[in-house]
């Protein structure tokens, strides 16, 4: 008995611990009861908000739209503020890391490299003084020319030999040029020589000699110019480069022969030779082409007195051959002659598209050769204003079509006619 009671007494403590457990379990479900109170409060607040919302005299869709717009505006403002703050932080960080390098660059742009800071900035960016100077110094190589000079004391003649040119730049689409050389003595530009055109080459060999009749006593005040051009059949010829020789620096005790680098030519204005006005009329049924030389103006002064004695030659040409030739009367001592002289040529209709009319204004000289002031041609393979004039004539048969034309240098027109055969 004693042992049984003793066992019951020992079992009592565990019983008390088991009985204590339920209260701890009872406290846990109490929290949901507290959450339910919060939900009731939220539902009451929601109900109150909806009641107030219902009092507003607007349909539900309008309220929803207003709410969406308001939310979008708030989000946009927040995004802009965040972006602005981040941008400021980045700029400050860059300024600290680079030590104001950008500020120096701006100053470099404004001051164009006048201070030591600009030089330091160049060093930072990897540019050196040599590299800076190389940009404007990118001088294009223009090639070189070989020539010879001699003087014939018995005949008072300067002998200029154009031997060859080399390493010329390519000015044509095919990677070549069509070079030729103009030779003249300054200050007198009236007498000019030129070599033959050499096709599609950058190393032309000319081997041509030209003679200038100049007394030795006057030679020292003159300058020889050798200008290399690229021939262009459709437009003005491009100058490649030139070389000038002052005659007072040449020793004419022996023949001079040397290579010299071509230099960039000064852009000289096209010498104004004057303008000429003439009319064209074609009658297809009769095969008759009529050219009326009306007048010329602002002609180049050719005589010592500052005037000229101009007259006009008209050539009918086909395939480089002169078929017919006409000329006007000579007008004395004038740079603005008036002619109004008519000339007719027989040209069958099937040939009218193949012929050319070449108009040349010349200065009459009693002694010596008559010098050409300038010329122009219309018809087959003409371009620009000359082509328009010819086209207008063909488009208006039996009607005279008058037009002004600018005179061009004789050598340029002759070169174009030589190609356009």
Curated annotation (Swiss-Prot):
Cofactor: how and how many bound: Binds 3 Ca(2+) ions per subunit. The ions are bound to the C2 domains.
Main location: membrane
Pfam families in UniProt: C2 (PF00168)
Top-level taxon of origin: Eukaryota
Keyword terms, alphabetized: Calcium, Cytoplasm, Cytoplasmic vesicle, Differentiation, Glycoprotein, Lipoprotein, Membrane, Metal-binding, Palmitate, Repeat, Synapse, Transmembrane, Transmembrane helix
Membrane topology: Single-pass membrane protein
Protein name (database record): Synaptotagmin-1
Binding site for Ca(2+) 2: 171-172, 230, 232, 238
Lipid sites, type S-palmitoyl cysteine: 77-78, 80, 82, 85
Family: Belongs to the synaptotagmin family.
Chain ranges of the C2 domain: 141-260, 272-405
Binding positions for Ca(2+) 5 per the UniProt entry: 303, 363, 365, 371
Role this protein plays: Calcium sensor that participates in triggering neurotransmitter release at the synapse. May have a regulatory role in the membrane interactions during trafficking of synaptic vesicles at the active zone of the synapse. It binds acidic phospholipids with a specificity that requires the presence of both an acidic head group and a diacyl backbone. May play a role in dendrite formation by melanocytes. May play a role in regulating the secretion of hormones relevant to the reproduction and egg-laying of female geese.
Transmembrane segments annotated in the record for this chain: 61-81
């Amino acid at each position: 008995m004693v042992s049984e009671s003793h066992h019951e007494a020992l079992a009592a403590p565990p019983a008390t611990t088991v009985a204590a457990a339920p209260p701890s379990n009872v406290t846990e479900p109490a929290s949901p009861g507290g959450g339910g109170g919060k939900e009731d409060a939220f539902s009451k607040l929601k109900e109150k908000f909806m009641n107030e919302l219902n009092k507003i005299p607007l349909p539900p869709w309008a309220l929803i739209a207003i709410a969406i717009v308001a939310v979008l505006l708030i989000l946009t403002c927040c995004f802009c503020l965040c972006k602005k703050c981040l941008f400021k932080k980045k700029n400050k960080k860059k300024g600290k890391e680079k030590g104001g390098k950008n500020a120096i660059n701006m100053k470099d742009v404004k001051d164009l490299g006048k201070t030591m800071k600009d030089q330091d900035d160049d060093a930072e960016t990897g540019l050196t003084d040599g590299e800076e100077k190389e940009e404007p110094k990118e001088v294009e190589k223009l090639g070189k020319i070989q020539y010879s000079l001699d003087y014939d004391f018995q005949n008072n003649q300067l002998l200029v030999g154009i031997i060859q040119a080399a390493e010329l730049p390519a000015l044509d689409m095919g990677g070549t040029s069509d070079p030729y050389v103009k030779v003249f003595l300054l200050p007198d530009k009236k007498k000019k020589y030129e070599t033959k055109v050499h096709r599609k080459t950058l190393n032309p060999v000319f081997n041509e000699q030209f003679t200038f009749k100049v007394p030795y006593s006057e030679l020292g005040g003159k300058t020889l110019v050798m200008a290399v051009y690229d021939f262009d059949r459709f437009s003005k010829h491009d100058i490649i480069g030139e070389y000038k020789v002052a005659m007072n620096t040449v020793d004419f005790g022996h023949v001079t022969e040397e290579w010299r680098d071509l230099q960039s030519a000064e852009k000289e204005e096209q010498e104004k030779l004057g303008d000429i006005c003439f009319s064209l009329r074609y009658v297809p049924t009769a095969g008759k082409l009529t050219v009326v030389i009306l007048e010329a103006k602002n002609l180049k002064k050719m005589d010592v007195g500052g005037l000229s004695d101009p007259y006009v030659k008209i050539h009918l040409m086909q395939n480089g051959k002169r078929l017919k030739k006409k000329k006007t009367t000579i007008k004395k001592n004038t740079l603005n002659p008036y002619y109004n002289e008519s000339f007719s040529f027989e040209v069958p209709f099937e040939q009218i598209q193949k012929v050319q009319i070449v108009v040349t204004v010349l200065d009459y000289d009693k002694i010596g050769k008559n010098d050409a002031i300038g010329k122009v041609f219309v018809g087959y393979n003409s371009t620009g204003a000359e082509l328009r004039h010819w086209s207008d004539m063909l488009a208006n048969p039996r009607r005279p079509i008058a037009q002004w034309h600018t005179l061009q240098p004789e050598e340029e027109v002759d070169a174009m006619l030589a190609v356009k055969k």
